[in-house]
Regions:
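Auxiliary Fe-S-binding modules of radical SAM enzymes
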Residues: 1-17, 62, 71, 188-325
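Canonical Radical SAM [4Fe-4S] cluster-binding loop centered on the CxxxCxxC motif
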Residues: 18-58
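Short strand->helix junction
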Residues: 29, 46, 85-86, 183-184
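Conserved alpha-helical substructure of the radical SAM core
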Residues: 43-79, 94
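Glycine-rich beta-strand-to-loop/alpha-helix junction loops that act as flexible
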Residues: 79-85, 113
Length: 325
């Protein structure tokens, strides 16, 4: 049983916000309108607002069809995201419609940094989804620039207006995410602005999170539990499950047989591919790849010794990432 593809289809991963989520990468590379300090996919290589079919619908849907054809773990939602901002892909609407045909009855979610919400074409395509998870980390212009590092000329005002317009157009579920960094966007001024904004936006849910994996830049540090509690109390209303912990992959796949060196080598390639997407702990990697933890530990030691992987500690946990990602 295959638990993770090496291409544009990845997971399923156990997401605190969505459940067992099968991911689709609409960019195929780190292409984004932002270069967030905390980005777990590494620094943005192509900072752009140019919308293009970066991954054409036919290619992505073909990969998904092939993935579905083989035995695979169950999943609860298909999530459009990837290594950058998925709304940059002009084929997004076609992709959502194609996923509906291939996975009837499974909800489709889209992750977005909200930067293109002012574009009516983007809003029209997003309206095809069942769930949209936009992020808004700060309504203070200085904090927005510092944390999200947008393209020059990006307008917080346009993003704010675009989100409010989208809320009126969209019949699905809107889950707003606010990610806090220590000393960066955890100010009282930001909290007051976010409080007023969420009252106006009326999302179905607000998720206040912080980094749970090493980010793209070393100055990004997780917000404290007290800060998270303060923001959650003001923005989230009633108590709800938090999404700040490391994601855990769905544990449906049996352990691989790692006896043969060829299989081990193949597993090594999958580990490198997975770590190129985001840093992960040994146990989350083992779970995602359906591999035994002892095998993974040995493999990670070997890859570290060869300079292909590096270990970083965050919040008492050791994360591995691909060198040069
Ligand atoms: S966190 Fe999201 S919005 Fe920020 S740089 Fe990474 S992919 Fe882009």
């Amino acid at each position: 049983m295959r638990a993770e593809s090496q291409g544009l289809v990845f997971g399923p991963v156990r997401s605190g916000r969505l459940g067992a989520s099968l991911g689709l990468d609409l960019l195929g590379a780190k292409i984004c309108t932002f270069d967030c300090l905390y980005c777990e996919a590494g620094a943005t290589r192509a900072l752009t607002a140019a919308r293009r079919p970066y991954v054409p619908a036919a290619r992505l849907l073909g990969e998904l069809a092939a993935w579905l054809f083989e035995p695979h773990p169950p999943f609860e939602v298909v999530t459009l995201g990837g290594m950058g901002e998925p709304t940059l892909n002009t084929d997004m609407g076609q992709i959502i419609e194609g996923v509906r045909e291939l996975c009837p009855g499974t909800p489709v979610a889209v992750l977005t940094n909200s930067s293109l919400m002012a574009d009516p074409d983007v809003r029209r395509d997003l309206c095809l989804a069942d769930m949209v998870l936009p992020s808004m980390d700060s309504l203070m212009p200085s904090e927005f620039l510092q944390v999200n590092r947008p393209l020059p000329g990006a307008s917080l005002m346009d993003i704010r207006r675009g989100l409010l317009t989208f809320r009126r157009q969209f019949a699905g579920k809107l889950f707003l995410e606010v990610l806090l960094l220590a000393g960066m966007n955890d100010s009282s001024e930001n909290l007051a602005r976010l409080e007023a904004f969420t009252a106006e936006l009326a999302p179905d849910r607000v998720d206040v999170t912080t980094m749970s994996r090493p980010g793209a830049y070393p100055q990004a540090l997780p917000a404290s539990p007290a800060t998270l509690a303060r923001f959650r109390e003001a923005l989230c209303g009633e108590a709800r499950p938090l999404a700040a912990g490391p994601e855990k992959s769905a544990q449906f796949a049996p352990p691989l047989d790692n006896e043969g060196s060829r299989r081990l080598e193949a597993l090594g390639m999958r580990v490198l591919d997975s770590l190129a997407r985001r840093p992960q702990t040994a146990s989350s990697l083992a779970s995602a790849l359906g591999a035994g933890e002892a095998d993974l530990a040995n493999l990670l030691d070997d890859l570290s010794a060869r300079g292909l992987v590096k270990a970083v500690t965050l919040g008492g946990e050791t994360f591995f990432s691909r060198v040069g990602r």
